[in-house]
């Protein structure tokens, strides 16, 4: 894994990024456009094991001209790292070792809340919100990262 500052230096235009929201049961996936300006929810993967996740990511990467991976880091509100942050860090490290792309961790505080509230503003019904919350949270994470990278 690399730092966001190194990622900013190394990232190139005309490639897309994947954003990941690694949950205990589901993994939200988002992808940005090639101009790296808009993050879009892509899919939700039911969590099985890290190797199957990596295989699934390799397919997405191959099919979508992906140039980097941004993983939501569940930092506690006080800035400390809890048990879920350690788990995410372990998975992100395995992804980084298995896929030859830059991988960074991005602070995901309030991403799920933000995604849920945004879908509420868009008048999406509750059952659809629940089905898509993980990929929407991944888009929220990715959008924050690409906004930072572009400024």
From Swiss-Prot:
Is-annotated flag, keyword Ribosomal protein?
A: no
Q: What does the UniProt function comment say about this protein?
A: Could be a nuclease involved in processing of the 5'-end of pre-16S rRNA.
According to its UniProt record, the EC number is 3.1.-.-
GO (cellular component) term, any one: cytosol
Top enzyme class, one word, equals: hydrolase
Annotated coiled-coil segments of the chain: none
According to UniProt, the name of this protein is: Putative pre-16S rRNA nuclease
Name the predominant localization.
cytoplasm
Where in the cell is the protein located?
Cytoplasm
What the entry lists under InterPro entries is as follows: RNaseH-like_sf, YqgF, YqgF/RNaseH-like_dom, YqgF/RNaseH-like_dom_sf
The Gene Ontology terms for molecular function here are: nuclease activity
GO biological process assignments: rRNA 5'-end processing
Keywords from the named record = Cytoplasm, Hydrolase, Nuclease, Ribosome biogenesis
Q: What family name appears in the similarity comment?
A: Belongs to the YqgF nuclease family.
Q: What SUPFAM superfamilies does the database record attribute to this sequence?
A: Ribonuclease H-like
């Amino acid at each position: 894994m690399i730092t966001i500052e190194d990622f900013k230096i190394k990232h190139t235009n005309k490639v897309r990024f994947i954003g990941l929201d690694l949950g205990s049961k589901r993994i939200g996936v988002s992808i940005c456009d090639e101009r790296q300006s808009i993050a879009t929810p892509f899919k939700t993967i039911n969590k099985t094991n890290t190797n199957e996740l990596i295989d699934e990511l390799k397919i997405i990467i191959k099919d979508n001209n992906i140039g980097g991976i941004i993983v939501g880091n569940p930092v506690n509100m006080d800035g400390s790292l809890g048990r879920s942050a350690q788990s995410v860090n372990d998975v992100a490290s395995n992804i980084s070792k298995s896929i030859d792309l830059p991988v960074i961790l991005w602070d995901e505080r309030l991403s799920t809340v933000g995604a849920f509230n945004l879908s509420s503003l868009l008048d999406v019904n509750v059952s659809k919100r629940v089905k898509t919350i993980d990929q929407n949270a991944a888009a929220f994470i990715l959008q924050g990262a690409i906004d930072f990278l572009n400024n």
